[in-house]
Amino acid sequence: ANSTVGQVVIQLCHLLKLRSVAVVRDLGSMDKVGPWLKTLGASEVLADTGSLKKELEKNKYFAKPKLGLDCVGGQSAVRLADTLDDSAPLVIYGCMSGRAPSWPWSQWVFKQMQVRGFNLRKWMKSNKKKIPAMMESIAKLVNADKLRVTHTEYELGTEFDEALDHAMEEGRSTKILLKVKDIGVTY
């Protein structure tokens, strides 16, 4: 949930008055990441270890999530699916772990688990007419400071090495934006 997509989803949920549970890989920075995600609007922040279902119950979070979003795959997706309400969809949009999730048959039968894939490129190809309005809506939220994405800016011509070093940092929580000086070309 501390990825850029996760941060945006948390903020959109907050704007829509939906509760969100942020699940993050614990890379030793939970004490910093947890409070940050809460300021963005996360209702709960959990480390992606052990039983997420038991953690939610321990925190008195009794409503089961109605939607899961996963970009990690493997056991992380299995733990996430275990928390979901019956028939609630788990949407997978990536597999950063490089491992396919493998669910027990009981998830499929008794919980009527639904797993769906999401491919942004395919969605954009089939929804070309919706994209300008969607981007305009997002831009309005950004301009109104209701949607924030953390980033660090570097000048392409003079700070490329610093940007590359920053990109290689483990546990980095910001996106890197390379700025290009005006080259005199108008489009």
Question: Where are the predicted features?
Answer:
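Conserved beta-strand scaffold positions in the cores of enzyme catalytic domains, especially
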Residues: 44-45, 115, 153, 175-177
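Glycine-rich phosphate-binding loop and adjacent beta-alpha segment
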Residues: 16-18, 33, 75-146, 179-187
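Mid-domain Rossmann-like dinucleotide-binding core that forms the NAD(H)/NADP(H) cofactor-binding site
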Residues: 1-50
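C-terminal capping/lid region of NAD(P)-dependent oxidoreductase domains
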Residues: 62, 145-152, 161-187
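Flexible cofactor-recognition loop at the NAD(P)H-binding site
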Residues: 50-51, 74
